[in-house]
């Protein structure tokens, strides 16, 4: 299995649009073109009442990257959650997830982790998103950028990074596992349908199953039993790797759900597992000292 076979099988291909790659200097508005039309009847829209929410710039050694931040308007410092994007980048759904977390009392931060490689928001073909942008993003760069995001959050004075959690979806689900093995400051992680196995490469030398023994925080994995790109056998393999390493991990597999069952803006959305997973996320962060 090549590195992105799981993602490509899990996501429906769309029509092709040629374009010139543009380096992202700000976040996209709305939803990624690759998921149009949006399933408006199920899309959840969380308001920003009582919140400070919007785009920020995170300093890096080689410049800045855009990010979306949401937090309560009053009080703090707040427990901190990194929100890691799907394959489609930091679009409206990821921003809405940040606002949902902020309504629960968190400082939520979603950095645009593709910023150096290109802007996926104008692409309408998933294979193109993978080949032109996502496949060129090194895991080491992502880990470093997330470290910088934590430092940025701490520097605001509004984020309690001693209570640090991470959650991610699809591409970000895989990153959630990797970051929980990378940063000892992480208290807990929740990975939504993130790929667990795959071929290694120079840019992506390890997958979650390879770093199970290095996990530094408890991780909850939320998966769909009908996900065509993430076979249940690979989930079982990750379970065994965590068990053999003596790591605290839990897995919930929703039998009838496919990939992206939490993505309420897409036809893949399944309300019951999405709502159950969201409750489990809250309980997991509370249990392991993030809340």
Curated annotation (Swiss-Prot):
According to the UniProt entry, what is the EC number of this protein? 3.1.1.45
**Cysteine pairings via disulfide bonds:** none
Keyword Hydrolase included in the entry's annotation: yes
Short name of any one Pfam family annotated for the protein: DLH
Provide the leader sequence positions.
1-40
Q: Provide the coiled-coil residue spans.
A: none
- Which protein family is named in the record? Belongs to the dienelactone hydrolase family.
Designated name of the protein = Putative carboxymethylenebutenolidase
Classification from the root reads: Bacteria, Pseudomonadati, Pseudomonadota, Alphaproteobacteria, Hyphomicrobiales
């Amino acid at each position: 299995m090549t590195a992105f076979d799981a993602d490509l099988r899990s996501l429906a291909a769309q029509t092709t649009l040629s374009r010139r790659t543009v380096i992202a200097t700000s976040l996209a508005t709305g939803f990624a073109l690759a998921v149009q039309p949006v399933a408006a009847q199920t899309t959840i829209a969380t308001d920003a009442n009582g919140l400070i929410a919007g785009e920020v710039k995170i300093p890096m050694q080689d410049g800045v990257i855009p990010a979306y931040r949401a937090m309560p308007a009053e009080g703090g410092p707040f427990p901190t959650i990194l929100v890691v994007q799907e394959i489609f980048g930091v679009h409206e759904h990821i921003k809405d997830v940040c606002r949902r977390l902020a309504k629960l009392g968190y400082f939520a931060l979603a950095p645009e982790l593709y910023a150096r490689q290109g802007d996926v928001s104008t692409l309408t073909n998933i294979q193109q998103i993978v080949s032109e942008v996502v496949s060129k993003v090194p895991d080491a760069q992502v880990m470093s950028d997330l470290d910088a995001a934590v430092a940025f959050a701490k520097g605001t004075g509004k984020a309690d990074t001693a209570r640090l959690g991470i959650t991610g979806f699809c591409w970000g689900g895989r990153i959630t596992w990797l970051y929980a093995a990378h940063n000892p400051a992480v208290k807990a992680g929740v990975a939504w349908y993130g790929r667990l196995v795959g071929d290694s490469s120079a840019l992506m030398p390890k997958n979650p199953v390879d770093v199970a023994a290095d996990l530094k925080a408890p991780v909850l994995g939320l998966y769909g039993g009908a996900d065509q790109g993430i076979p249940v056998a690979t989930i079982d393999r990750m379970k065994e790797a965590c068990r053999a390493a003596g790591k605290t991990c839990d897995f919930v597999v929703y039998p009838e759900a496919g990939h992206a069952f939490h993505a309420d803006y897409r036809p893949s959305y399944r309300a019951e597992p999405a709502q159950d997973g969201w409750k489990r996320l809250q309980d997991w962060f509370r249990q392991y000292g993030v809340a």
